[in-house]
């Protein structure tokens, strides 16, 4: 109090007073924090609308405002990054920052955008590389190029007449050797067609009392096995067109053949599979029994350790080199299993296809004895073959379209569907370079298709590509 008895007036602050300002209350701090961090708690898939007259401040980023503000002495060494960031923030239509040397009044106009925003923008991608907007709208971001699907020619590049090519689902009358020679059984004769020279050679004639039911090349491509309707298996020297030996065992026709080095497996209508070592004097070294109906499909794995067999009893069996009983049995198919193919890319991966009542391609892991997947193709599966160049396979089909389908594995997406045959496509073989397939049908034609790419490890021209186009006869 002063001398008059009045209270002293409160001190007034001056310009030179260095006393600190009063601290904000905790409630004010929480309010400011909520305002600053409001964007971080907004759902990326939810659009928030504000009042029709009051803009939504949550959509604004004031901390980034000076990105586009000209600054004296700013280093322009990171112009590329600045351009990319500006595009991500304000869009591709915003002009770049201008310096005072360029103009005295820098423009902050945002074309095609409202100054006030009345709703928050919804982020399009939860995996966006940009923290501000969808990558698709940022032209400065380089995306991985989308690989265009490989184009497969829809027409065969060559057609051969094949008179007397039988329309029998249980036979295997076409095979392609490692020496690029195609063997075809026509009636009671076997013909060889050299894919390099287009030369046709008549290998054998079984006579009027017999007919060819199967052909199969040895892995070296020098010898051809011929299964006959009388139950015999003949071995021919292809270069000399000379029969080396004839082996018995089957009581009925031999419709399936498969080689494993010097071991030849034959499957017949008598439900049996015979293992024959052509180096020995005996006609067969073992007999495999298990199927309850005709054996119509046989394939050795690429490591020659497992033999897969399919029969008209709707069964798929897997045998090893020493077993006389199947080590694996698969009974999921509901029709005859003729189409069998081992993957050259993954050990133990086996594909099989069922007949008219089944229509499915199934995949099996013989290492773990498991069923992997099933694809309903919509029609009879007549044959299967894997590409050795890419992880794809081809299936041939019967009624109603008689189509040839190229599949990607494991997605089983269709790469191409080829048509042209007027009968079911019963026969299928692949060229030694892995690029071309040949298909045969009861319409008595053989059609050649380029479906697979060349091997990446070598730059080779397809030996088949030099062949003349058009239609010729194989005999």
UniProtKB/Swiss-Prot annotation:
Record's keyword terms, sorted: Cell cycle, Cell division, Differentiation, Mitosis, Nodulation, Nucleus, Phosphoprotein, Repeat, WD repeat
Short motif (PEST motif): ranges: 7-28
Phosphoserine modifications at: 43, 45, 144, 155, 454
Residues found modified as Phosphothreonine: 99
CSM motif (motif): residue ranges: 80-91
Outcome, altering residue 155 to E: Mimicking phosphorylation and leading to reduced activity
Annotated Gene Ontology cellular component terms: anaphase-promoting complex
Pathway: Protein modification; protein ubiquitination
UniProt-reported outcome of changing residue 43 to A: Increased activity and binding to the anaphase promoting complex/cyclosome (APC/C)
PROSITE patterns found in the cross-reference section: WD_REPEATS_1 (PS00678), WD_REPEATS_2 (PS50082), WD_REPEATS_REGION (PS50294)
UniProt family annotation: Belongs to the WD repeat CDC20/Fizzy family.
Domain notes: Both CSM and C-box motifs are required for binding to the anaphase promoting complex/cyclosome (APC/C).
Protein name: B-type cell cycle switch protein ccs52A
Source organism of the structure: Medicago truncatula
